């Protein structure tokens, strides 16, 4: 196409515009239209992204305000609005908030369903999916919702997820609740000695160990 335009330019300078236009005119017009549509389409898409992002931001903030006022159910309904769910970043945020709000109103079934959806979503950031996987397991263990939860907790502990340390702490606490203090002490000791574990968690489990002495 570049050679075509160069040839047209040279021929025009030689006063052969009329003949060339009859030959190449339709291609020049077509190329110009493609360029205009491409640039205009990108600009339109870019502006739409900005507009959609602004709408999502307003709707998301409004949902948080409703939650802060105590209307958690209304906040969940607002987070389900289309203008939030169609914007990638806000879609993930709204799902996370919906799960947390469902927990606040004791709708554990809805919370678990949302945690699972987040964890299995192809387009969400890995860190968000790992958080959701942890919450999906932790809630089931804490609320004793199903018998498979403990096995899933052990599986999570065996991974390289950054949440494995909290999962291990939960396991130790459940051991205490079932009267198995020896197993709890072993787990807490492992966490306290693990240099990869978060410092605050290591301090916390050290306090648990003092209590269990």
Kindly label every feature range from the protein language model:
Residues 89-213:
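Soluble extracytoplasmic domains of inner/organellar membrane proteins
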Residues 1-34:
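N-terminal positive-inside, membrane-proximal cytosolic segments immediately preceding the first
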Residues 50-57, 73-76, 93, 147, ...:
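Amphipathic alpha-helical repeat elements characteristic of tetratricopeptide repeat
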Residues 58-93:
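Short extracytoplasmic
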Residues 36-47, 71-83, 111-120, 147-155:
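Repeat-mediated protein-protein interaction surfaces in helical alpha-solenoids
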Residues 7, 14, 18, 40-57:
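Aromatic-capped interface at the extracytoplasmic side
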Residues 15-19, 23, 85, 158, ...:
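Membrane-helix interfacial "entry" motifs
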Residues 2-10, 61-67, 91, 104, ...:
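Acidic, proline/glycine-rich low-complexity intrinsically disordered segments
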């Amino acid at each position: 196409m570049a050679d075509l335009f160069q040839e047209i330019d040279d021929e025009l300078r030689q006063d052969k515009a009329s003949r060339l236009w009859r030959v190449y005119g339709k291609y020049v017009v077509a190329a110009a239209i493609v360029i205009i549509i491409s640039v205009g389409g990108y600009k339109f898409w870019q502006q739409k992204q900005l507009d959609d992002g602004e709408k999502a931001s307003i709707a998301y903030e409004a949902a948080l305000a409703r939650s802060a006022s105590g209307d958690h159910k209304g906040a969940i309904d607002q987070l389900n609005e289309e203008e939030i769910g169609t914007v990638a970043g806000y879609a993930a945020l709204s799902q996370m908030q919906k799960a947390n709000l469902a927990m606040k109103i004791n709708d554990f079934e809805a919370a678990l369903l949302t945690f699972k959806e987040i964890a299995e979503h192809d387009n969400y950031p890995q860190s968000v999916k790992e958080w959701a996987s942890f919450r999906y397991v932790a809630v089931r263990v804490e609320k004793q919702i199903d018998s498979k939860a403990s096995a899933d907790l052990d599986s999570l502990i065996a991974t390289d997820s950054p949440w494995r340390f909290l999962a291990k702490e939960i396991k130790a606490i459940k051991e205490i609740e079932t009267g198995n203090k020896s197993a709890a002490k072993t787990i807490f000791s492992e966490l306290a000695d693990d240099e990869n574990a978060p410092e605050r968690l290591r301090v916390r489990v050290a306090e648990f160990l003092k209590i269990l002495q």
